[in-house]
From Swiss-Prot:
The gene is mdh. This is Malate dehydrogenase. Belongs to the LDH/MDH superfamily. MDH type 3 family. Gene3D superfamilies: Lactate dehydrogenase/glycoside hydrolase, family 4, C-terminal (3.90.110.10), NAD(P)-binding Rossmann-like Domain (3.40.50.720). The keyword NAD applies. One of its GO terms (molecular function) is L-malate dehydrogenase (NAD+) activity. PANTHER family: L-2-HYDROXYCARBOXYLATE DEHYDROGENASE (NAD(P)(+)), L-LACTATE DEHYDROGENASE. SUPFAM superfamilies: LDH C-terminal domain-like (SSF56327), NAD(P)-binding Rossmann-fold domains (SSF51735). It holds the Pfam family Ldh_1_N. It comes from Sinorhizobium medicae (strain WSM419). InterPro entries: L-lactate/malate_DH (IPR001557), Lactate/malate_DH_C (IPR022383), Lactate/malate_DH_N (IPR001236), Lactate_DH/Glyco_Ohase_4_C (IPR015955), Malate_DH_type3 (IPR011275), NAD(P)-bd_dom_sf (IPR036291). Substrate binds at R83, R89, N121, R152. Catalyzes the reversible oxidation of malate to oxaloacetate.
């Protein structure tokens, strides 16, 4: 049986990390693509030379022509400009929208049957534009945000409670930005909801609010520390989890930026919600019950994403 083919569009820090993780997990043969000739070829060769040491069988090639992604089963898009200190994700809009137009055309021509995972920021607007530019089915184009945001939330909670990260489940809804909505009520330690843990004296509401805010600022905290770029290990691991769910038909319940067609009262937009990912792409959107405060926070997040999509249309009217 032929191996799966994974196309990584963008060979920066996330792209290289994606290639290494995909190789280690033997998800398939890997093509690193970048318009900067030499970088994908060099990274591909470097990672390939680690395969005898690490014991994985996968072909790794680098390319600067979209024809190399032909027939890919999964495309993971990181192409674009990363955040620098002082920039918001939204500051990247104009630059990265043009990149999405080129990437969308490449995928449309060479990999129209792929499951596409977008990581480029501002995430919710970029995945929406990428689906429009590529013309791929809406359930086959998703944004990586919720898995990463939930992972950050889970880590901070595990540190607060001094328990294993494996015993924490966490939910983050909404846009991938300052208005994201980490849901304490639906987050648990070994099945015990966070509000119950406050009553049990494990933490305080004030401490939990600080953790929620730190989760919202998770990307900016790393940008501020690195000073020359943005996070790449955790974003890459998060996207690989989504790709693996698709390739192995795992039916994983994963939060991601998915296309909504009426769920949560939202239409024709990509927003972070819990989904089931399997061989059909986004096979189901899970519509959880939100209380008044949660719904208001979610609606505020949706409004922020809608504003970004409107800004995209102003730049590229063809997106209407």
């Amino acid at each position: 049986m032929a191996r799966n083919k994974i196309a990584l569009i963008g060979s920066g820090m996330i792209g290289g990390t994606l290639a290494h993780l995909a190789g280690l997990k033997e998800l398939g043969d890997i093509v690193l693509f970048d318009i900067a000739d030499g970088i994908p070829q060099g990274k591909g060769l470097d990672i390939a030379q680690s395969s005898p040491v690490e014991g994985f069988d996968a072909s790794l090639t680098g390319a600067s022509d979209y024809s190399a992604i032909e027939g890919a089963d999964v495309c993971i898009v990181t192409a674009g400009v990363p955040r620098k200190p002082g920039m918001s994700r939204d500051d990247l809009l104009g630059i990265n929208l043009k990149v999405m137009e080129q990437v969308g055309a490449g995928i449309k021509k060479y990999a129209p049957n792929a499951f596409v995972i977008c990581i480029t920021n501002p995430l919710d607007a970029m995945v929406w534009a990428l689906q429009k530019f590529s013309g791929l089915p809406k359930n086959k184009v998703v944004g990586m945000a919720g898995v990463l945001d939930s992972s950050r939330f889970r880590l901070f909670l595990a540190e607060e409670f001094n328990v294993s990260v494996k015993d924490i489940t966490a939910f983050v809804l909404g846009g991938h930005g300052d208005t994201m909505v980490p849901l304490a009520r639906y987050s648990t330690v070994a099945g015990i909801p966070l509000p119950d843990l406050i009553q049990m004296g494990w933490t305080t509401k004030e401490k939990l609010d600080q953790i929620i805010q730190r989760t919202r600022d998770g990307g900016a905290e790393i940008v501020g520390l690195l000073k020359t770029g943005s996070a790449y290990y955790a974003p890459a691991a998060s996207a690989i989890e989504m790709a693996e769910a698709y390739l192995k038909d795992k039916k994983r319940v994963l939060p991601c930026a998915a296309h909504l067609s009426g769920q949560y009262g939202v239409k024709e937009m990509y927003v972070g919600v819990p989904t089931v990912i399997g061989a059909g792409g986004v096979e189901r959107i899970i519509e959880i019950d939100l209380n008044k405060g949660e719904k208001e926070a979610f609606d505020k997040s949706v409004a922020a994403v809608a504003g970004l999509c409107e800004a995209c249309i102003n730049i590229a009217p063809s997106l209407k």
